[in-house]
Amino acid sequence: MINLIRTNSENKGFIDLVKLLDAELAALDGDEHVFYAQLNKTDTIKHVIVAYENDTPISCGAIREYSPTTMEVKRMYTLPGHRGKGIATKVLNELEKWASELSYQKCILETGWRQPDAIRLYEKNGYSRIPNYGKYAGIANSVCFEKEITG
């Protein structure tokens, strides 16, 4: 059984999963990883979801405020052996629910062109592509999305 918990970036399960995520992204991004790493600091994230299976952390995601009306989805990751089972969708849905409870109106996010599974996840969950925003503007490997979460 999958159990989702709301926590923050000090959660050990989240920290362990993010280390695995960073290693995977370093292999995918190559020389560009240094640029992306500076945008993915996790030390002050207040809103984190960790999915556990039998007390083992298997998936995570986070949101942080981008603007007074918008949360940015960050650090989405699922262990390779647990992918394709809908766990990331559950984490994403819980993040959106949390953002809505906090009175935010939409979520935005950035992922990489080298991550087709992530792109499919966001598209199948109702995210629409938008021009690259903020520090991702002009970055060829980035693809950005948004989704209205109130309605």
Residue ranges, per PLM feature:
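Acetyl-CoA-dependent GNAT
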Residues: I2-K74, L79-P80, L92-N93, N132-K135, ...
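Conserved catalytic-core motifs of GNAT/GCN5-like acyltransferases
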Residues: S9, H33, I108-W113, I119, ...
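Alpha-helical interaction/dimerization surfaces of two-component signaling modules
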Residues: L17, L21-E24, W98, L121, ...
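Conserved phosphate-binding and hydrolysis motifs of nucleotide-dependent enzymes
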Residues: D55, S59, G86-A88, G126
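Short coil/turn segments at alpha/beta junctions that flank glycine-rich nucleotide-binding fingerprints
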Residues: T69, K85, E101-Q105
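Conserved acetyl-CoA-binding loop-helix of GNAT-fold acetyltransferases
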Residues: T78, G84-K97, K124
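Conserved GNAT acetyl-CoA-binding A-motif
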Residues: L92, A99-T111
